[in-house]
Amino acid sequence: MEQGVRMIALGDPEGSDKASQLIAIASSLGLRSSIITSNPGENFESFNHGAIDWKEKMAMAHWVVNTASMVTAGPSPAMAWSASMTFAELEGCRNVMIVDMPSDPESISMVWGQVIEKVRQIHVLFFTSDSLHAISKLEGSDGSDFLSRVREKTMIPLVCGYSESDSCA
């Protein structure tokens, strides 16, 4: 039986999303980790997400990492994003959600709504600096107590973020 932590993430083929970047760092530190994405030459926006064998991919995985903005990457990434969290819950993996800003900042409310719909499946919720400010503004809360309020309302075990302007985590 394999030992140690294993992480998987749904990521774009270029590796430019935060989940792919986290997996790259984890791999460089020696953690067994992999990125699930479209096949080479396949359009990521419309890749065959139904071909992903989540049960196999999650065998022995401890963590599944997703980015909130993945729901705006196209219909297939959005469906794979949702499926990854559902299968993680069924297979006993922990879900990490990195709440980042979508390429179109106007869609942040839709992205945040999608995260809220999956909140019971999330174990770690991390906000990037820009998303922390945008979502706290959406929620009508100042940044200083926003993370605590999210934690209390959602019962997610770990809610965290980083604010460059406040120099706090």
Specify the residue positions occupied by each region the protein language model found.
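Ribokinase/PfkB-type carbohydrate-kinase core domain
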Residues: M1-A169
